[in-house]
Amino acid sequence: MSAHLQWMVVRNCSSFLIKRNKQTYSTEPNNLKARNSFRYNGLIHRKTVGVEPAADGKGVVVVMKRRSGQRKPATSYVRTTINKNARATLSSIRHMIRKNKYRPDLRMAAIRRASAILRSQKPVVVKRKRTRPTKSS
């Protein structure tokens, strides 16, 4: 079944849809922007890209759909864990998408998603407030 036909079926009646604040969001896997649109849908396309946080809380996991074996959902995804510094992680995601000519329209969305995940994994440094000495009169 073509992606366009699947989109016509799924676009208004999917278990992943969330409609609130006059906008429609989607919680499906491999939807990089969580937006209910044809381009970012993670279920209907033959090639999809997903970026998730790693299980141990350090790094990201890039999920890509295989071209072959589309009828076998258990083996249709390739998961690659990237546990490097931020610049190397974003660079390797960029190369995975660009060098393989794999959905170039999703490149920037995948990089931004990975950047947000890496930023959230950074430890937060608590700044101590400076207290002024009390005035004695």
From Swiss-Prot:
Keyword set includes Ubl conjugation: yes
Cross-link (Glycyl lysine isopeptide (Lys-Gly) (interchain with G-Cter in SUMO2)): K58, K65
InterPro entries in the cross-refs: Ribosomal_eL28 (IPR002672), Ribosomal_eL28/Mak16 (IPR029004)
Source superkingdom: Eukaryota
Record's subcellular location: Cytoplasm
GO BP terms: cytoplasmic translation; translation at postsynapse; translation at presynapse
Alphabetized Pfam families for the sequence: Ribosomal_L28e
Record's GO cellular component terms: cell body; cytoplasm; cytoplasmic ribonucleoprotein granule; cytosol; cytosolic large ribosomal subunit; dendrite; postsynapse; presynapse
The protein's name: Large ribosomal subunit protein eL28
Species this chain originates from: Mus musculus (Mouse)
Gene: Rpl28
